[in-house]
Amino acid sequence: MASTACFLHHHAAISSPAAGRGSAAQRYQAVSIKPNQIVCKAQKQDDNEANVLNSGVSRRLALTVLIGAAAVGSKVSPADAAYGEAANVFGKPKKNTEFMPYNGDGFKLLVPSKWNPSKEKEFPGQVLRYEDNFDATSNLSVLVQPTDKKSITDFGSPEDFLSQVDYLLGKQAYFGKTDSEGGFDSGVVASANVLESSTPVVDGKQYYSITVLTRTADGDEGGKHQVIAATVKDGKLYICKAQAGDKRWFKGAKKFVESATSSFSVA
């Protein structure tokens, strides 16, 4: 563009000696110069606009690149949470600290983390016992006994099975005849009511699950809620029994008893 301007100015200088030929030549020169000057100015304006446009595009492009780099370089913080969700401020996966896994010889289950192991042997074939720190009535036991049955269903219905292992329901202190209060019949000092029973299948293995409420004439928190899970494998009867007193059952112990027995399975 600079060379074009020089050529036009040089052409105007050469044409100037012809000024004496008449006013028409002057008018032609004037007319011929102005359009060229206008064109030059217009070209410069276009260049300026192009520079401004390119500058704007460059800024937008640079901003886009910066935003993209920030998006790629940034990492979502584990503390970020969607609306209505609790933020994990420490950035670690949340774990269920109320239970701890226990892997025994041929079985596994979840044990309440605040329960402690106990050496008390309450049943034949008992291989594990845990109890509540504050109330030994809340406890769980695992029994492994030899059997000639091939499946838990060989014991009959869940109720039939329970009648064959009724020692799991415990004993009370008094065995004499009495007319006790609390809804017991004359001469009856204990009762057991099956509240629920089911026959779940876990990994192709049949289980029995039975929930029982036992009550005795000698009291003991108004009764005990006992949950029994059982199955048979390789000539062995596996039983998991957990319980809690009636009062604690409704104050939160139910969750620990039911979760422990429902997690019980044979390897």
UniProtKB/Swiss-Prot annotation:
Q: Name one GO cellular component term.
A: extrinsic component of membrane
Taxonomic superkingdom: Eukaryota
Q: Where, per UniProt, does this protein localize?
A: Plastid, Chloroplast thylakoid membrane
Q: List the GO molecular function terms.
A: calcium ion binding; manganese ion binding
Keywords of this entry: Chloroplast, Membrane, Photosynthesis, Photosystem II, Plastid, Thylakoid, Transit peptide
User: From what organism does this protein derive?
Assistant: Spinacia oleracea
Q: Give the GO terms filed under biological process for this record.
A: photosynthesis
InterPro entries, per database record: Mog1/PsbP_a/b/a-sand, PsbP_C
Where does the transit peptide lie? 1-81
Q: What is this protein called?
A: Oxygen-evolving enhancer protein 2, chloroplastic
Q: Which family does the similarity line name?
A: Belongs to the PsbP family.
* Main function: May be involved in the regulation of photosystem II.
Annotated TM spans = none
Q: What induces it?
A: By light.
Stored SUPFAM superfamilies: Mog1p/PsbP-like
